[in-house]
Every structure is written in structure tokens, then in C-alpha cells.
Amino acid sequence: MNGLNVLLTGACGRIGKTFFEASKERYRFTLTDRLTPDFDVGEHRFVHADLSDKTRLAALLDGIDVIVHLSGIPHASASFDALLPNNILATTYLFEAAVAAGVKRLVFASSAQTIEGYPVDRQITPGMPVMPANLYGVSKCYGEALCGYYAAKTPLSTIALRIGAFEFTETHELNNARDLSAWLSPRDAVQLLQRSVDAEGVKHLIAHGISNNRFKRLDLSETTRVLGYQPLDDAFETFKIPITY
């Protein structure tokens, strides 16, 4: 282990479980979710918690160096009523508590839905304005704005990861060129998260979370330069799906 104490929210989700299983010998984890893990947490700590209850956060963050915040409603069709407690309030409370606890960095799971309003044939480059196509994307834009605010006004380092279409190769829902161009493979997701936790000298970054796909919905040049991210997988080679738009 490298000595870092990491709070992983949404630990029972697909990305959370994948990251934990690949990194459990690398970090000391406090895992949290409203669900019960279906995997062995071993020597690590698991705490049932609803992050929209701010009274739970101080105890969760005691001794934590880095937060990897994956929890929240992940559905593009989610309503505002569902998003408000889970994606807006819980995220706000977590940032507030992180600063109060002296956490060094918060890695926020944003989404490619923040830019889904752009035409599918337009690559998203760093600095382009957000253009969400649904309220879920709006909630992730809010999280990105929190990252910028807290990085500017407090000692907290923040990295927002615009995660694309995370899918396992055996069971996936990639159906067209748009999906393939945004694919993030499990092993590339692990690498991206580890590099985000470990990176030195980064105060604030909005990074792009996709694999090394032949056609890329999101440009990876800045993410590669700042984090040293070197994705290994290509959806077009891996899945060989006939390309439709």
C-alpha cells in the first residue's frame, strides 16, 4: 500500500467494485454505500451511509486523505426529485465536510452527459462549454462547478472525471458509433482513478474518462498530459460492432 486513506463512495456500484477489487492492496479504503457489499472487503472498512444525511459525514472522513466520489443516481432519465438529494445535496455536503476534515483531494465522478447536447460527430475538447441533454447531465455540471469553486477557494484539490460509457466486455449495451466512441473499459477506468488519486501537483482538473477508442467522443490530450493516463483498450477493436449512428 502507498499509505493513502481513501473514502470510496458508491462502493457497491459497478465502477466502485471494479476499482476497489483492483486497488485494495494499493490503498487503505473506507467504503460506503446504501447497499450491502456482495464482495469481501477484507481488512478494509465498510460503512452503510446515506450521504444526503450530513450528520454522518464527519465520522466517515476522519483520517481520510482522498475521496473518490462515485455515488449518486446514474441514470440519464432521472427526475429532478430523484437527483436533488442524491446528486446535488449529497455532493454539496461531501465537499463541505471534506474541507472541514482537511481532506487533500476529492475525485468527483462526473459524466460525458455534461456534453451530450453536442452533435455526435463533434469531438469534445478541453474548455468547451458544458451542454447537457438531460437533468442528470445538469447535476454533473453542478458537481464540476463545485470542483472549481472549492479548488479556487479552499486548499482542497479537485479532479472531475467525465466518465463515458463504462461497460464490461462480456455484458454490454454498446450499440452504435456514439457508444463505442465513449467506451471506458474496466481496466482503463481503474488506471484513470488510480492516477487521479495519486497525481501530484494538480489543484483542479476536468479530465475525460474514455478508453483509447479509434474515434474518441472526448479528446484525451489534456488528461494524458496532466495525469499520465495511458488507456489500453479500443472499443472498435474489442467489440467489432457494425458502425451505425
Q: Can you annotate each of these PLM segments?
A:
Residues 205-207, 212-230, 245:
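Conserved C-terminal active-site "lid" loop/helix of NAD(P)H-dependent oxidoreductases
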Residues 93-131:
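Conserved Rossmann-fold NAD(P)-dependent oxidoreductase catalytic core, especially the SDR/UDP-sugar
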Residues 4-25:
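N-terminal Rossmann NAD(P)H-binding glycine-rich loop of SDR-like oxidoreductase domains
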Residues 85, 122-158:
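Catalytic helix-loop patch of NAD(P)-dependent Rossmann-fold dehydrogenases
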Residues 163-169, 183-205, 212:
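Alpha-helical substrate-binding/gating segment
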Residues 52, 82-93, 138-141, 184:
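Glycine-rich NAD(P)-binding loop of the Rossmann-fold in SDR/ketoreductase-type enzymes
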Residues 76, 112-122, 135, 166-169:
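Conserved catalytic-site region of short-chain dehydrogenase/reductase
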Residues 38, 49-86:
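NAD(P)H-binding glycine-rich loop region in Rossmannoid oxidoreductase-like domains
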